[in-house]
Each structure stands twice: as C-alpha cells, then as structure tokens.
Amino acid sequence: KLISPDGKEITSSSANLTKNIIKTWGIRENTNQKLLKLSNITKIFDDRSISYRKKLIDEKAVKAVNDVSFELFEGETLGLVGESGSGKSTIAKIITGLVRPTAGELEYNNFSLYNSKKKYQISKSRGQIQMIFQDPYSSLNPRFKVRDIIAEPLKFFQKNITKNDLDQSVFDLIDIAGMTRQSLDRYPHEFSGGQRQRISIARALATRPRLLICDEPTSALDVSIQAQILNLLKDIQDELHLTMLFISHDLPVIRQMCNRIIVLKNGIICETNEAETLFNNPKHQYTKELINLMPKIESII
C-alpha cells in the first residue's frame, strides 16, 4: 500500500467488485504469455508535422522514438520512465493508434496492429487496448454527462446492447471507480481532478480491456489523491487481471507500481530491468542520474 505525506497508510478507495462484475467480465487467468511486442519502432516527426514555433528554432526532423524494442507480458505492469521529451507518450500513442510509426513492427496478441501502409488495424484489438490520459479534464467531453461518457464506448463496441444491460454496465463501472451513482447525472466540470480521473478510469474499463496504458495518470493531482488513484489502479489490476503499461517521470511512483522498468532518453532505451534490481543496482549512467535526483527525506532531529 502507499503512504501519505503524514505517514499514514492510504487504503483503497475503490468499491469492492461485485460478483456480477466478476461474472460478466470474463476474467482471464494471468498466463505470463507475451501480450505486446514492439520491434524496432521508430517515429520521426518531419517539418510537416511539427509546430511552426519548432520550425523557427530548428528545421531538422525530430526522431521522437529511435529503434525501440520491448515485450510486455500478460498480468505484469511495465514502467516507462524518462524526462520530458524522452518519447514515452509517443510510444503510448503508437500502441493505441493515435500516432503512426515511421518504421518498425507492433504486435498485439500475435497479430500485427499496423498493415504494410502503417495503417492501424483497430479490428485486431477491438477495444482490448485502452488509455488513461494525464489530464482527465481535457480527455472528457464537457458537454456529456458522466453517464454518457461511460456509455459511449459500450454502445460503440456492443451494437446490440439493451438499455437495461447498458444501464447496469454503467452502474458497475462507476462502482469500480469508487464513485457514487448520483454522479452519473453531473458534468465533468463539477468534479475535482481526482474524481475526473476516476471517471476516465471507468470509461477506459468500459470495453473490458486486457491492456491498460496509463500515461502519467496522477501527475496533475495532489499527492494524497495520487496515492488513492494508484491504489485504485492496483486493486483493479489485481481483481480483473489486467496488464498495464505505466508511464511516468516520477521514479517513486514507477518503483511502487511496476514489475519491470524501461528507462528512456531521447527516444532510445538506456536500460531495462526488474524494478528493485534497477533501483538497487542501476547499470546506465543516465539511470544513475535519475535515481540520484529522487527526493530524499532527511532525518529530522
């Protein structure tokens, strides 16, 4: 469990998952089989895809991701850590089809997610890959009530869902996120940042994904709220047997959440290792520098 700044253990604030949720979810046992594979992924942003301001500074193309390869196994949490501009979010967007890779191969469950023309084949994942974004307010439609935000992916991926089943699924998802059902008839601007992120989590779970990509999901939140959201994600992963790709520049959070960690710098992988091994015995100089920059609590006399 995570500890709050005052030294108290922060317990999970998620609702207990009901038998109905477990029964209808179709829980898969963790097999430790390869779920995701990136092979020599490269992304180059040329002068047509970078901002005008960037062009004034430097007209050269930007290689955001450079020959990145790694595997993600079912049931684990893999961390991507690095400073801003290291390529973490670009990798996440490539996996979810928001950005096309310039080169390389991406496989999900042994199927290629990009065809020969680098077009994303959503039919291969069908909602099994979902993403939780850094800013929950920007990722939620301000014109939709919470009920509609959560129901939208359900209606998209389950064309023949009945109204009763839709309503029950929305109730289940808001329960999982630890929110009250009364919140379903309110708009995003009526909630705090932590509550909005809970709504984002409920929406991401609507398609019953196998892989959840968390792109700095707590960096915009207060420290105590961060711990609650992290515990919520860990509880959900344990109960629903999800696989996670967790992206952050916050090393203590990465250490707490992840089984393995990949360190990125300028779009290149510097080091990959088990979490505790990486922190206790870092090999790459950049990894050592990041760890040395971690805030340390000095003894108070």
What are these regions (language model features)?
Residues 269-273:
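ABC ATPase "signature
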Residues 254-256:
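A short, surface-exposed alpha-helical micro-motif characterized by mixed small hydrophobic
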Residues 104-114, 125:
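Conserved ABC transporter NBD signature motif
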Residues 208:
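Conserved catalytic motifs of ABC-family nucleotide-binding domains
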Residues 164-182, 291-292:
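Conserved ABC ATPase "signature" region
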Residues 96:
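Helix-to-loop junction immediately C-terminal to a conserved catalytic motif
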Residues 187-191, 195:
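Conserved ABC ATPase signature
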